[in-house]
A protein has these predicted regions:
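Sec-dependent signal peptide recognition
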Residues: 2-9
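Hydrophobic h-region of N-terminal signal peptides that target proteins for export
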Residues: 10-18
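Short N-terminal segments immediately surrounding and downstream of signal-peptide cleavage
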Residues: 20-37
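Surface-exposed, charged secondary-structure patches
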Residues: 22-25, 68-112
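Short, well-ordered alpha-helical segments enriched in acidic and aromatic residues
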Residues: 39-52, 56
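A short gly/proline-enriched turn/hairpin at secondary-structure junctions
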Residues: 53-64, 75-81
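A short, structured loop/turn motif at beta-sheet edges
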Residues: 91-98, 119-127
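Low-complexity, intrinsically disordered terminal/linker segments enriched in charged
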Residues: 122, 130-155
Length: 155
């Protein structure tokens, strides 16, 4: 094969290989996050977040800095329970050092949920900068859930 052709193929394929490697790294980051939560591995779970990360939980009051989220999660992790969300599907977008994702998860108590977030490449390592967990409500019962939510919000 001609050296120019080999060089051209290398130059054309390298970005695809790098993108695939990045995608694999991001999937491993998120899969590891869910595994660490399931196994109640406090240190490795929180090491996956950036130091300035924000976590949004299912309750309207749950907007936490990573330190606030650690305080919330610590008792569950110390009891060895953590929490279990099984990934059903995941999608992500973005290029370069910032990507965003959405994933459908399943939890025994809450049913299907959605996790969305942003990951950022910092010092050669992907970190979660933002994660939001929401409950998925089927349209057929959305009004009923809305009524219950408004009732629960009353002082």
């Amino acid at each position: 094969m001609n050296i120019k052709l080999i060089t051209l193929l290398f130059l054309l394929l390298t970005p695809l290989i790098e993108a695939s490697d990045r995608n694999t790294e991001i999937d491993a980051l998120l899969d590891g996050l869910h595994q660490d939560a399931h196994e109640a591995n406090f240190e490795t779970y929180f090491a996956r977040y950036s130091s300035d990360a924000i976590f949004l939980g299912t309750d309207k009051t749950e907007r936490w800095t990573i330190e606030e989220f650690k305080d919330y999660a610590k008792p569950a992790f110390e009891d060895g329970h953590g929490w279990t969300y099984v990934v059903v599907e995941r999608n992500w977008e973005g290029k370069g050092q910032i990507k965003w994702f959405d994933e459908i998860l399943f939890n025994e108590k809450l049913g299907h949920c959605r996790g969305t977030g942003v990951v950022e490449l910092k010092n050669g390592e992907w970190k979660i900068a933002n994660y939001a967990l929401t409950m998925l409500v089927p349209n057929a019962i959305a009004v009923e859930v809305g009524v219950q939510t408004k009732e629960a919000d009353k002082p």
